[in-house]
Curated annotation (Swiss-Prot):
Bilayer topology: Peripheral membrane protein
Pfam family, one: NPL4
Additional free-text comment from the UniProt record: Present with 1050 molecules/cell in log phase SD medium.
Keyword Acyltransferase (UniProt): no
Name of the protein in question: Nuclear protein localization protein 4
Primary gene name: NPL4
Cellular component GO terms held in the UniProt record: Cdc48p-Npl4p-Vms1p AAA ATPase complex; cytoplasm; Doa10p ubiquitin ligase complex; Hrd1p ubiquitin ligase ERAD-L complex; nuclear membrane; nuclear outer membrane-endoplasmic reticulum membrane network; nucleus; perinuclear region of cytoplasm
GO BP terms: cytoplasm protein quality control by the ubiquitin-proteasome system; DNA replication termination; endosome to plasma membrane protein transport; ERAD pathway; mitochondria-associated ubiquitin-dependent protein catabolic process; mitotic spindle disassembly; mRNA transport; nonfunctional rRNA decay
Length: 580
């Protein structure tokens, strides 16, 4: 698709995809503008003087998320750099390719794009692992030697000792950055991260026609060797309340059918791993679906449109879509609540189809990174499955898939197979070129050998395992929502639960009429209630904002006072009073 930009330099067209970050689109545009344009002052709007947004605020959102369509025109405004900066001191985009793999050497450091707050916070930390003075130390209490000096956050022995399977993303990033950008390199800079791309280059102009009529060593992808990814983008999944999971599982308990949902929350520091990140789950939203005993079906277009609306409303609450969760449960028939253990080391953990689903979701939710030459790297989107463990208990398992898995799926190189633990390698066609694919394994003699992956290979090579849990009961949780149950969840009509005025009256009316503001705050601080009230279109935009502030903010008293005095809220209470 093409997006048009009108500026004082004229009109420019930028080619992009729906899932491209807006920051990436702007990077492509900058090369066509005046070199003196100050990127930090970029603003865009649809009409002159209306709805002006700073580009830095939109950089980490996708083209689709912004609602942009093919041919849309945006007005770009910016200021020129001061005279003392026109020599190029602050230019961020210019880069030069230095080898055939596409590693780019920048003169002035990382890209200037907005990252997540947790990434900005962890970037400032060194992550060093402290060590106590040992018997080998020969110095005093104030001294330090090689036996007690802090370890780097990627230290292998520390992770093995503490049974941490993968190093954190920021530990991995610092390790790469330390090797790629040493002080002796002077002002030159090499992006330590680069997204793998296994697609054939159909725009190669190296003296031949494009694929499938021609091919050369520059446009065809190299042979791929799969291996376990050493890092993970997210280290831990934390569910703020156990009620969230219990209510989600209730759907299976009532119907015996499986259930799927999207998790909403945020990302924050995880202290149990050096420079770790945890995904904090505040709520689960279940899109429209038809549940079955061994799976479920969904209308993809219907779910896509509905989730775009939910994403916007969740964003107003300070939440984003951070993962997906689904059940795979079968009652063991013992009458004690036990379930079958289907997923284990001798069967599979995630099936090949589930791995492909996870990879597609991760590519739709890219992780913004100024240290990547593309402006993004992998994803923080997580996948959780609720199934039976070896003891027959209901348990949660959390995963991500590797950057190699994302690239394989994007290049359409793999598909599901009849064996859930194996991914089938697709054949080369006019649309795709599939190179040789290998994976490393230990043979019967314990020697690591390289195996040809065709026609299929174990999907475990694409998995990254995460830990999960709940906040410590000893410490106060900072959950955004006081209540997770009481008001029906969306799209549960098949279970005999529906969101309507009767349910809303049963849940809210008596409290709304009582004058007890503390209890009213507890009631409205419910993710599903907020979404339903918004769908009624009774409250004005300002009143909706007051409702959100009353529900999710720590200092909610003033906002709630204004809300209950508003015309929209009083209209809602009156409708509930008159409803049957």
């Amino acid at each position: 698709m093409l997006i048009r930009f009108r500026s004082k330099n004229g009109t420019h067209r930028v080619s992009c995809q729906e899932n491209d970050l807006f920051g990436t689109v702007i990077e492509k545009l900058v090369g066509n503008l005046d070199p003196n344009a100050d990127v930090d002052t970029f603003t865009v709007c649809e009409k002159p003087g209306q709805g002006i947004h700073a580009v830095s605020e939109l950089a980490d959102r996708t083209v689709m998320d912004l609602g942009l369509k093919h041919g849309d025109m945006l007005i770009l405004n910016y200021s020129d750099k001061p005279a003392n900066e026109k020599d190029g001191v602050n230019v961020e985009i210019g880069s030069v390719g230095i080898d055939s793999k596409g590693i780019r050497q920048h003169r002035y450091g990382p890209l200037r794009i907005k990252e997540l707050a947790v990434d900005e916070e962890l970037e400032k930390e060194d992550g060093l692992i402290p060590r106590q003075k040992s018997k080998l130390c020969k110095h005093g209490d104030r001294g330090m030697c090689e036996y007690c000096s802090p370890l780097p956050p990627w230290d292998k022995e520390y992770h093995e000792k503490n049974k941490i399977k993968h190093i954190s993303f920021h530990s991995y990033l610092k390790k790469l950055n330390e090797n790629a950008n040493k002080k002796e390199n002077g002002s030159s800079y090499i992006s330590p991260l680069s997204e793998p791309d296994f697609r054939i280059n159909k725009r190669c102009h190296n003296g031949h026609e494009p694929w499938p009529r021609g091919i050369c060593s520059k446009c065809q992808p190299s042979a791929i060797t799969l291996q376990q990814q050493e890092f993970r983008m997210v280290d831990h999944v934390e569910f703020q309340k156990s009620e969230i999971i219990n209510e989600f599982i209730q759907a299976w308990r009532y119907t015996g059918m499986q259930r799927f949902g999207y998790m909403y929350g945020s990302y924050s520091k995880y202290d149990n791993t050096p420079l770790g990140i945890k995904a904090v789950v505040e709520a689960i939203y279940e899109p429209p679906q038809h549940d079955e005993q061994d799976g479920l079906t969904m209308d993809v277009e219907q779910v896509k449109n509905e989730m775009l609306q939910i994403d916007r409303q969740a964003q107003e609450m300070g939440l984003s879509r951070i993962g997906l969760i689904f059940t795979d449960l079968s009652d063991a028939g013992a009458g004690d609540g036990s379930v079958f253990c289907k997923r284990h080391k001798d069967s599979f953990f995630l099936s090949s189809l589930e791995v492909i689903m996870a990879a597609r979701h991760q590519t739709r939710h890219p992780n913004v990174s100024k240290y990547s030459e593309q402006g993004f790297f992998s994803s923080k989107f997580v996948t959780c499955v609720i199934s039976g463990n070896l003891e027959g208990e209901i348990d949660i398992s959390s995963y991500q898939v590797s950057t190699e898995a994302e690239a394989l799926v994007t290049a359409d190189m793999i598909s599901g197979s009849t064996f859930p633990s194996m991914a089938y390698i697709n054949d080369t066609t006019d649309e795709r070129y599939v190179p040789e694919i290998f994976y490393m394994k230990s043979n019967e003699y314990g020697i690591t050998v390289k195996e040809n992956a065709k026609p299929a290979f174990p999907v475990d090579y694409l998995l990254v395992t995460l830990t999960h849990g709940f906040p410590n009961t000893d410490t106060e949780t900072n959950s955004k929502f006081v209540s997770s149950t009481g008001f029906p969840w969306s799209n549960r009509q098949a279970m005999g639960q529906s969101q309507d005025y009767q349910e809303l009256k049963k849940y809210l009316f008596n409290v709304a009429s009582s004058g007890d503001f503390n209890l009213l705050h507890e009631k409205i601080s419910n993710f599903h209630l907020l979404l339903y009230i918004n769908s009624l279109q009774i409250l004005s935009p300002d009143e909706w904002k007051l409702l959100i502030e009353s529900a999710v903010k720590n200092e909610w008293e003033e906002s709630l006072l204004k809300l209950v005095s508003s015309a929209g809220w009083q209209t809602l209470v009156m409708i509930l009073q008159e409803s049957g």
